[in-house]
Amino acid sequence: MMRTLFKSKIHRATVTQADLHYVGSVTVDAALMEAADLLPGELVHIVDIDNGARLETYVIEGERGSGVIGINGAAAHLVHPGDLVILISYAQVDDAEARAFVPRVVHVDADNRIVALGSDASAPVPGSRTERSPQAVVAGG
């Protein structure tokens, strides 16, 4: 049996640009892609924290160190510069691998610089007002 699991996320990134007339995708700083184990062309889901929009698209590599999170194409109707978003990727793994799988969580600041790396999908963002859900079980706890 194959299972689809949360593989990685870039949490609370700030959208830096939106280009309605581009052919599609999301442009992501190469350093963020590396930290989140994302490849060019990889499927990601984007969740807009500000307005609740959810969409899926693919990743295009952006300039390393630029902090770019650029929404391209029709998605620019839903997600705008300044919006906070979560970029989420998934992996299909067999049952045995799923039981030992460790995801990657990339926390960024307002300029999309990495402030923390982890593997706990429910961990609060360091230095923010975010909180862990009171119903979440802490791994290993």
Swiss-Prot record:
| Alphabetized GO MF terms | aspartate 1-decarboxylase activity
Name recorded for this polypeptide: Aspartate 1-decarboxylase
List the record's Gene Ontology CC terms alphabetically: cytosol
What compartments host this protein?
A: Cytoplasm
Q: Which gene encodes it?
A: panD
Where substrate is bound, by residue? T57, G73, A74, A75
Q: Name one Pfam family in it.
A: Asp_decarbox
Which Gene Ontology BP terms does the record give? Answer: alanine biosynthetic process; pantothenate biosynthetic process
Q: What does the organism's lineage look like at the top? A: Bacteria, Bacillati, Actinomycetota, Actinomycetes, Kitasatosporales
